[in-house]
């Protein structure tokens, strides 16, 4: 019993240290890199010179930009043109806020342009990390390839995913996930952030603890995936873990 208690204590210490490291990363100047790129480079360049560089696209009226990420050959980021830190922001559950997940899905075409040929929808995934699972303090959705093993697992669970948030059998990448099936028309009308906040008990009060991802299924529906921070299981709710920025699925 003493050994078990000691092991539990060690796990708690490790979890606290990991959380502390994550917080430290978010308080440094580097955590504002993306925000500076958007607000000090992309947006002014588009407004003054009609040139989105260094972004791939700037849509001031729609409230977003698309930026090629340095990590991986096909990864892009969709970000707002104004200050939103991340999933904890109450703006994301405001109906007047742009539907960033739907906009990010439309921006998947940048992957195909970069690749030189169409990237199948089944190979694409969207993800945003939780407050403790991210390294940047400017809201950004990762548009990238899905890991082949995650793709296979979701295909195998197609029949088990319903229109309600339910635990995904077996989880993903060693972490627990909730899964919810949505149609394209439903996604167009309602943000996944609002679905999570309104349909999962107590989620609205703790949105910053969640990472959220989206993948297209073989029946043309979408599956939303939500994972909640759990320091005891060393889950920082980094939904980006379902992605493979090297795009092995295309080989």
Curated annotation (Swiss-Prot):
Pfam families: CDH (PF02611)
EC number(s) recorded for this UniProt protein: 3.6.1.26
Pathway: Phospholipid metabolism; CDP-diacylglycerol degradation; phosphatidate from CDP-diacylglycerol: step 1/1
A GO cellular-component term linked to this record: plasma membrane
Subcellular location: Cell inner membrane
Family designation: Belongs to the Cdh family.
The protein's name in its UniProt record: CDP-diacylglycerol pyrophosphatase
Organism: Escherichia coli (strain K12)
Taxonomy of the source species: Bacteria, Pseudomonadati, Pseudomonadota, Gammaproteobacteria, Enterobacterales
